């Protein structure tokens, strides 16, 4: 497998990172190394490519950005660990379904290994749940065998804006975060822990 470079982008506007993902993906070559971007966003709602406006109940003046990822509307904000996967899935011998499974399983493994939390998936509702409350949302896009976008893990944040929407298109979906279980939850640690689990799974699948 080729090297995967990690980039810690810190706190960045969603639109800037989205544009950078598009630029990276459109200009990469078969020799371009894969990258994983670690980032935190100021408050923003993002709509998936099939997102329905009625799932935004009241934006409360939080910006809304249309994207080309899968899924419906979600919220990003400070204290949420976001990880983006800029991968050549053909080179890594991954299909779209296998990539989604790997992204989800890495989160389940991370929560179990480092926090002794038993997380699960729900058929037909992508994401990671603890006691049927959603702790992580994912949305990916694959273009010409290259992936971008990724997963957002609620870590230590204000969850209130999730009540302004139907998260991922589900009315009344309850959200949770790592800080509900560990008050000192830290997004930098979560990003590193998650990435380690993801890379391990990716290496084992090739």
From Swiss-Prot:
InterPro entries in UniProt: aa-tRNA-synth_II/BPL/LPL (IPR045864), BPL_LPL_catalytic (IPR004143), Octanoyltransferase (IPR000544), Octanoyltransferase_CS (IPR020605)
SUPFAM superfamilies named among the record's database cross-references: Class II aaRS and biotin synthetases
Positions that bind substrate: 69-76, 137-139, 150-152
Source taxon at top rank: Bacteria
Keywords: Acyltransferase, Cytoplasm, Transferase
Site note Lowers pKa of active site Cys, residues: 134
Gene Ontology CC terms: cytoplasm
Coiled-coil ranges from the UniProt annotation: none
Record's keyword annotation contains Protein biosynthesis: no
Range of residues in the leader sequence: none
Pfam families xrefs: LplA-B_cat
Biological processes annotated in GO: protein modification process
Every BPL/LPL catalytic domain range: 30-206
E.C. designation(s): 2.3.1.181
Tagged with keyword Disulfide bond: no
Enzyme class name: transferase
Disulfide bonds: none
Catalytic activity, reaction form: octanoyl-[ACP] + L-lysyl-[protein] = N(6)-octanoyl-L-lysyl-[protein] + holo-[ACP] + H(+)
Cellular localization per UniProt: Cytoplasm
GO molecular function, one term: lipoyl(octanoyl) transferase activity
Function: Catalyzes the transfer of endogenously produced octanoic acid from octanoyl-acyl-carrier-protein onto the lipoyl domains of lipoate-dependent enzymes. Lipoyl-ACP can also act as a substrate although octanoyl-ACP is likely to be the physiological substrate.
Family: Belongs to the LipB family.
Note, other: In the reaction, the free carboxyl group of octanoic acid is attached via an amide linkage to the epsilon-amino group of a specific lysine residue of lipoyl domains of lipoate-dependent enzymes.
Name recorded for this polypeptide: Octanoyltransferase
Organism: Francisella tularensis subsp. tularensis (strain SCHU S4 / Schu 4)
């Amino acid at each position: 497998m080729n090297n995967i470079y990690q980039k810690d982008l810190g706190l960045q506007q969603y639109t800037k990172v989205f544009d950078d993902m598009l630029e990276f993906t459109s200009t990469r070559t078969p020799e371009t190394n894969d990258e994983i971007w670690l980032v935190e966003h100021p408050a923003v709602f993002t709509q998936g490519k099939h997102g329905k406006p009625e799932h935004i109940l009241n934006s409360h003046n939080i910006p809304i950005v249309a994207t080309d990822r899968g899924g419906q509307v979600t919220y990003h904000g400070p204290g949420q660990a976001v990880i983006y996967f800029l991968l050549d899935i053909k080179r890594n011998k991954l299909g779209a379904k296998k990539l989604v499974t790997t992204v989800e399983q890495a989160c389940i493994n991370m929560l179990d290994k480092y926090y002794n939390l038993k997380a699960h998936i729900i058929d037909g509702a992508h994401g990671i749940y603890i006691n049927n409350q959603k702790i992580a949302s994912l949305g990916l896009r694959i273009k010409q065998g290259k992936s971008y976008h990724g997963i957002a893990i609620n870590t230590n944040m204000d969850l209130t804006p999730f009540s302004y929407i139907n998260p991922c298109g589900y009315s009344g979906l309850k959200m949770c975060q790592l800080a509900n279980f560990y008050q000192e939850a830290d997004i930098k640690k979560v990003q590193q822990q998650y990435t380690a689990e993801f890379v391990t799974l990716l290496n084992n699948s090739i």
